[in-house]
Amino acid sequence: MALVVQKYGGSSVADAERIRRVAERIVATKKQGNDVVVVVSAMGDTTDDLLDLAQQVCPAPPPRELDMLLTAGERISNALVAMAIESLGAHARSFTGSQAGVITTGTHGNAKIIDVTPGRLQTALEEGRVVLVAGFQGVSQDTKDVTTLGRGGSDTTAVAMAAALGADVCEIYTDVDGIFSADPRIVRNARKLDTVTFEEMLEMAACGAKVLMLRCVEYARRHNIPVHVRSSYSDRPGTVVVGSIKDVPMEDPILTGVAHDRSEAKVTIVGLPDIPGYAAKVFRAVADADVNIDMVLQNVSKVEDGKTDITFTCSRDVGPAAVEKLDSLRNEIGFSQLLYDDHIGKVSLIGAGMRSHPGVTATFCEALAAVGVNIELISTSEIRISVLCRDTELDKAVVALHEAFGLGGDEEATVYAGTGR
């Protein structure tokens, strides 16, 4: 008997018909002799609707009360799926995040999981029940208030449950058949990948691939939990995220895929003194504004005045906060100008094979040049190349790179509904 954790996204439980279909899949898994724990997201666009409602009532909702409101969405879908399972003759019990033992930090809106104490879940499993856990939420270790986990929170909840319960696999159900070599909404012949290493998936998630969120993959790698990405609309096998690039033969010409991200902004600090300590002042200011940095580029110092420019990218949502913080410290830090650009896109090529194939970067740049895409910034890791371009050219760049590296499959990819979340 295996212990299986399943997670269903909002599009998978968007209405009564889809909820019943999900319940049938869960019951079928249970009848195969498995113990089953299910994590569900809020139905459809419920979270966005609740956010809109909150802002109509209060333009700046108190974070604690906003978390109380938003967690209601997952509790609703959780209970409805449990009812649907009961209607099919199986026994189910639903739990909120706090009832499931999800202990978090106290940061409302973006709490981190500290621990999971799943005693009540284990008791329910021993009673032969299907266990349902409301995703995206927990309880603060210090204040005992309800908290939300931020973007990708339900995925992270599912992997955390799998780790705490010692599950054999964590299945993430979405609206595509697995992880593809590119977004099938942009590249029609994107190829489904059978397996992806944790490192490759981390790079893909960090570069904008939306099927799995970065925090979820980090948690799975840390606890060595295999993650099986599947469609809730078909019985196709999906993609398994497992293992390390250390297990991939160095000489294998493996390129995993092309990822893209249109949610970033670019900040450039112009005329910064090129002496020790000034870059540190810039990034300390950004950190104090609670802004995570992605790509960084420092220009060669201008000999005539000893000044340099530093460019970094961050989420478009927090870009204005970074600019405001830096601008308030302009005289203290000593730069002359601040530039902000939120009309950029990031396109990335990921794959363990580029560790031993020196021509990859040249082909990458040639493919973009051939379709008239200008590279504004470039960043690399052992298994990734990322560049910035205009957001209007992003789709064109994705298609060009996918074709240049021969990543396409023989079949047209199927997208069943929604956005993959």
Swiss-Prot record:
Keyword flag Nucleotide-binding: yes
Residues that, per the record, bind ATP: 7-10, 41, 174-175, 180-185, 210
Gene3D superfamilies: Acetylglutamate kinase-like, VC0802-like
Mechanisms controlling activity: Feedback inhibition by threonine.
Binding site for substrate: 25-30, 45-49, 74, 125-126, 151-154, 274, 292-294, 298, 360-361, 374-375, 381-382
SUPFAM superfamilies membership: ACT-like, Carbamate kinase-like
Function according to Swiss-Prot or TrEMBL: Catalyzes the phosphorylation of the beta-carboxyl group of aspartic acid with ATP to yield 4-phospho-L-aspartate, which is involved in the branched biosynthetic pathway leading to the biosynthesis of amino acids lysine, threonine, isoleucine and methionine.
Protein's name in the database: Aspartokinase
